[in-house]
Amino acid sequence: MIVDVKAKSDYEILGQSQDDAVGEAFDKVGKLLGLPYPGGPHIEKLALKGNPSAYDFPRPMIHSDNLDMSLSGLKTAVLYTIQKIENLNEAIKADIAASFQKAVTDVLIAKIKKTIEETHRSDVIVAGGVAANKYIREEFKNLEGILNIKVYYPDLKYCGDNAAMIAFVGSMMSPSEEQNIRSQVRARWPLNELTQ
């Protein structure tokens, strides 16, 4: 999700996934590769041993006019690639992991470049579970000199669990004294519908 944070509790969603979230795509590809859950950290570790150019996976919506993303086609391309391989050994798994990680990162970088061009923002915060991925962090850090921006990340200890990040934001929005709050519960709640 790409969000323009104008002020505390003032958000505008500029782009989002049309299907799988980035972390969800990592988890699903991890499962296809027989890796433990969650897949993200295991793909990152395996990718270190692989060639990111071994497989030319698609970069869905990378050139679209909007800032939305779609990763289900990429995930499906990985599935079809795996199904064609008779002996899925560790070296091949590493190449698939590295190529997948690069494809996802290429899409993220392209969308952020487009965001900066459109919004003229100079600060980018990379957050969520995949913000712990060192490859993704490095690629975003490389944008600083190219786009004259500053990239920020939460400490790694806050990246592994979206619930912790959400709870932290909730604590910032809540008054210090205890309250009896009545609220509806929704599995998916658009960020721009939250109010203080």
Task: Please provide the spans of the model-predicted regions.
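Glycine-rich phosphate-binding/hydrolytic loop that grips phosphoryl groups
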Residues: 154-195
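Glycine-rich phosphate-binding loop plus the immediately following alpha-helix
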Residues: 5-51, 75-76, 80-86
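A short glycine/serine-rich beta->alpha loop
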Residues: 12-17, 63-66, 150-159
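Beta-strand/loop-alpha-helix module characteristic of Rossmann-like adenine-cofactor folds
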Residues: 1-3
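A contiguous, well-structured pocket-lining segment that forms one wall/lid of small-molecule binding clefts
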Residues: 45-124, 133-147, 174-177, 192-196
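Conserved phosphate-binding/catalytic loops in two-lobed NTP-binding clefts
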Residues: 124, 141-165
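Active-site metal-binding loops of divalent metal-dependent hydrolases
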Residues: 129-130, 136, 156
